[in-house]
Amino acid sequence: MEFRGDANQRIARISAHLTPQMEAKNSVIGRENCRAKGGNPGFKVAILGAAGGIGQSLSLLMKMNPLVSLLHLYDVVNAPGVTADVSHMDTGAVVRGFLGAKQLEDALTGMDLVIIPAGIPRKPGMTRDDLFKINAGIVKTLCEGVAKCCPNAIVNLISNPVNSTVPIAAEVFKKAGTYDPKKLLGVTTLDVARANTFVAEVLGLDPREVDVPVVGGHAGVTILPLLSQVKPPSSFTPQEIEYLTNRIQNGGTEVVEAKAGAGSATLSMAYAAAKFADACLRGLRGDANVVECSFVASQVTELAFFATKVRLGRTGAEEVYQLGPLNEYERIGLEKAKDELAGSIQKGVEFIRK
Ligand SMILES: NC(=O)C1=CN([C@@H]2O[C@H](COP(=O)(O)OP(=O)(O)OC[C@H]3O[C@@H](n4cnc5c(N)ncnc54)[C@H](O)[C@@H]3O)[C@@H](O)[C@H]2O)C=CC1
Ligand SMILES: O=C([O-])CC(=O)C(=O)O
C-alpha cells in the first residue's frame, strides 16, 4: 500500500502538470515537480527561435547531445508544442519551454550557451541583406536579454544577415558593458559543410575525410573557400575552382530556389548549428584542439569581424587563426569579400549607434 500511495502521489503530481491551468500558472512550460531531472552533469543551452524551421530540428539534435543537461526552448509562437514533443525523447537533457517576450528572461537565466536562429528567412529573389530590416531588431532585443540574464554565456548567432547581426550583437553587449569578443560567434559552419560536400563530390572522396577552410563572411562573395588549403592536399583545374567557388558561395540560394518560397536551408543548417554548438561545448569542457570556422571579432584583416578558423576553449574563441598562404585567385576573392563585408559590418554597427 505504501508503494501504491507513493506511485499515486507521483502520478497525481505529473498529471497536475499536464493541465492547462497548471501550465498557465507556471511561468515556464515544464514539469517543475517531477523527480526526473535527467541528472546529467552538463551544460545549460537555450535556443531562441526554437519553433522555427531551423529551431525545431536543432532542438531535436541538442536534446540528443550528451553534453547538454538543460535545454531551454524559447520562441514567440509554438514553443509549448515543440517543448512537449522534444521532451518525450529519452535522452539526458531536461527540456523546458518559454513562450513570448515575458518569458525571455527566464529562458536565458543561467545559460552557458545561447543559440539564436530567430528571424525571417529568405524567399527567392531576396539577398540576405534584405532580411536586415526585420532581423536586426529581433537580434537586438534577444541580445539585450542575453546581456541582462546570462552575460557570460557563449552566443552562437545564426540569424541573417550574419555579416551584420554579429556586429549588432557586439554593439548591444558593448552598450550593456558585457562584451567579451571571445564569446560572440557567428555561425558559418554550413558554408564549411557545403564546401566539404561539394569538394568531396569532385574528388570522389567521403565528405567526412575532407576539410575545406571557408573564410570571410556569410553572404555571396564574402563566402571565400580556400581550396588551396583543402585537406587532404588536392589540386583542382581552373574550371573546378570556378565551379566549386560559385557553388559554395551560392549554396544558400540553391536551397532557397529549390524550396520555391517555403524558406531557406533548415535541415542542413540545424545539422551545422548542432555540430558547431557541440564544438563550443567541448571547448567549454576543456577539450584540446577544438577548431572550427566562425565569424568573430578579428585582427586577421583590417575589418573588425571576419570568419577564419578559431580554437574553441573554456572561454570561447580563444585563438583566431591567420589566413595562411593564399593563391592569386583567393587573393582577388579576398579583396571582393572585404569590400562587401566592410559595408555590412558598418550597417550593423550603425543600427545600434544611430
Ligand atoms: N547562419 C546560417 O548559415 C544560416 C542562417 N539562416 C537564418 O536563420 C534564420 C531562421 O531561419 P528559419 O528557421 O528557416 O526561419 P523560420 O521562419 O522557420 O523560423 C524563425 C523562428 O524565429 C521565431 N522568431 C521570430 N521573432 C522572434 C523573436 N523576437 N524571438 C524569438 N523567436 C522569434 C519565429 O517565430 C520562428 O519560429 C533566418 O534569418 C535565416 O536566414 C538560415 C540558414 C543558414
Ligand atoms: O541562404 C539563406 O538565406 C540561408 C543561409 O544563410 C544559408 O543557407 O546559407
UniProtKB/Swiss-Prot annotation:
Tell me, what is an example of a GO biological process annotation in this record? regulation of photorespiration
> Peroxisomal targeting signal PTS2: where is this region?
10-18
Q: Which UniProt keywords apply?
A: Glyoxylate bypass, NAD, Oxidoreductase, Peroxisome, Tricarboxylic acid cycle
Q: What happens when the gene is disrupted?
A: No visible phenotype under normal growth conditions, but the double mutant plants pmdh1 and pmdh2 show seedling growth arrest 5 days after seed imbibition.
- Catalyzed reaction equations: (S)-malate + NAD(+) = oxaloacetate + NADH + H(+)
The active site annotation covers: H218 (proton acceptor)
Q: Which domain of life is it from?
A: Eukaryota
Localization: Peroxisome
From the UniProt record, list the coiled-coil ranges: none
Q: Which residues cross the membrane?
A: none
Q: What name is this protein filed under? A: Malate dehydrogenase 2, peroxisomal
What organism is the protein native to? Answer: Arabidopsis thaliana (Mouse-ear cress)
Originating gene: PMDH2
